[in-house]
């Protein structure tokens, strides 16, 4: 057993802000020119990671990244899209969220296997989950430490450590 491993263990090396500190992953090969125009910036962000800026991706990207760092489920984004009169199906929302996650523009956070949130803040950080109102909140402390990390099996490496601390109101 190792004594302690700093958590978070993996950090993003590219810190270029796009629409409220969303960063293009280092493997993207180019940095988009930011204008402050959400529509333009989403277009550049998608192209920088090799995704075609379709109407659906552009509209969902604008809804996702235009409001700053946040945590959304597919259902929450679908509801926002419906209110904004964006013609997309729930399946398209799921597909787009998964594509953006695979491209490194979103981070997927699972809460007890029943609820999955998509985080626009892809930097290494952890979360509080507020059980009473089903809300995910970033933990700002960069010095969290995981004590007694088990040995990693031969042939494997740690890709990422996710910590979700569940909270409920005192009774």
Regions found by a protein language model. Name each.
Residues 51, 66-70, 84:
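Short helix-capping/hinge SLiMs at alpha-helix to coil transitions
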Residues 93-103:
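Basic amphipathic alpha-helical segments that dock to polyanions
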Residues 1-39, 142-171:
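C-terminal regulatory/oligomerization modules of transcriptional regulators
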Residues 73-85:
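DNA-recognition alpha helix
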Residues 103-171:
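Non-DNA-binding regulatory cores of transcription-related proteins
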Residues 27-59:
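Short alpha-helical segments that sit at the start of domains
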Residues 45, 62-67, 80:
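Short amphipathic alpha-helical elements of helix-turn-helix/winged-helix folds
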């Amino acid at each position: 057993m190792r004594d302690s491993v700093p958590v978070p263990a993996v950090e993003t090396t590219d810190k270029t802000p796009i629409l409220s500190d969303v960063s293009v992953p280092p493997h993207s090969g180019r940095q988009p020119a930011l204008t402050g125009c959400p529509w333009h910036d989403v277009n550049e962000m998608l192209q920088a990671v090799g995704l075609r800026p379709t109407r659906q991706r552009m509209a969902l990207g604008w809804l996702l990244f235009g409001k700053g760092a946040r945590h959304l489920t597919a259902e929450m984004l679908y509801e926002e899209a419906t209110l904004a009169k964006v013609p997309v199906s729930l399946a398209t929302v799921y597909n787009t969220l998964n594509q953006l996650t695979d491209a490194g523009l979103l981070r997927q956070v699972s809460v007890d296997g029943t609820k999955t949130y998509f985080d626009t803040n892809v930097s290494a950080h952890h979360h509080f989950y507020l059980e009473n109102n089903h809300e995910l909140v970033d933990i700002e402390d960069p010095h969290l430490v995981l004590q007694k990390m088990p040995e990693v099996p031969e042939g494997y490496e740690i890709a990422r450590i996710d910590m979700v601390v569940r909270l409920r109101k005192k009774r």
